[in-house]
Amino acid sequence: MNPVGLYRLNAEIEHRFPSLGQWQAKGLALACWGLIIQEQCQISRMAESLPEWGAFNTVRQRLKRWLNNPRINVTKACYEWIAWVWSSCHFKRPVLLVDESKLGDRLAVMMVSLAFEGRAIPLLWRCYYANSALDYPQQGQVLLIYGLLAHVLSALPAGVRPLVQMDRGLAHSAAMLRALKDLKVDFLVRVKASARFTSRRGHSQLLSQMVKYGETSWAHGTLFTRDHAIKGSIYLTWEPGQAEGWCLFSNDPHLGGHRYALRWWQEESFKDLKSGGWQWQISHVRCPQRMERLLLVMAVSYGWMLSLGALLGEAPAQVQRQVATRDGLQTTSLFRLGLRWFKRLLHCTPAALQVTLWFAPPAFRAFRCALE
């Protein structure tokens, strides 16, 4: 296999991740390359795709040592990753998606991601043992999310005011909403219908009494009661065909509730990281710190493939037709389009394979308006 693409990847990682030493950067490049080739994040499978770098067991042990290396500062690397991602973004306002995902009863991860074209780019994460109150981060859920968002915000340029979205399992608490206000970000979050809302005129109702099937309504006032009351705007919608309505709360009265649909992009990305792409669920990694390093590999690889999918929109029509049909360009995810184009370039024209990030809506997609 022509190694020019791997050499370019290694050079770019050395440039973009100055906190990594030379061998640490090379280990990250090898892991990313093996992951993309095999579409599996098991160390042994990744090693199988790197025969030119030594005997199978030699390469496997090298990847294991990288994954086990406590000197790799994942938080610092994520700062550098965020800077690289943001320098490649071509839209004005970021939408940050916060969600938790679990790998069975083994591990859980709290992740902050950047919404992009039907998917979400992992920016920063924290892993811990699943379903264990004793092993959950000591600061608790609210401070955990607050800390992750604070890190992401500090890595973004001054003056950038993102929109934060999260589901009711994370957002339904006065403490969480106050934390978001303290961060000085705009937010649009889903809350439970059991919450009580009081209008500016003093009329108080449960949200379950306010949301009506087939209707959409807005109101300004306070969510929750007494010492827990939070001022903001409520957006209620229950579209035909939905099992239940959406009860959305925001500190920005001008935000439309339809923008909350972007939160589902996070679910699609988790699917890509798992059964739809990197097979995260069969990684066999059980240590939270090792999983955080493996997630760095998956995030860099995922961002590159999304970029290739977006860059396909700038390619000539004859190149696009080699990757997907006209309908396929509309219906296939950018992740899958990027993977297809990567493999075609790798085997047909390896010299044309570029290692770059590019997060601009391609001409054949119409998601741009949702981010502006």
Name every feature range the model reports, one short phrase each.
Residues 93-103:
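Two-metal-ion RNase H-like nuclease active-site motif
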Residues 1-40, 77-79, 92, 105-107, ...:
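Single, function-defining residue in the core of a domain
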Residues 66-81, 85:
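Short, basic alpha-helical nucleic acid-contact segments in DNA-binding proteins
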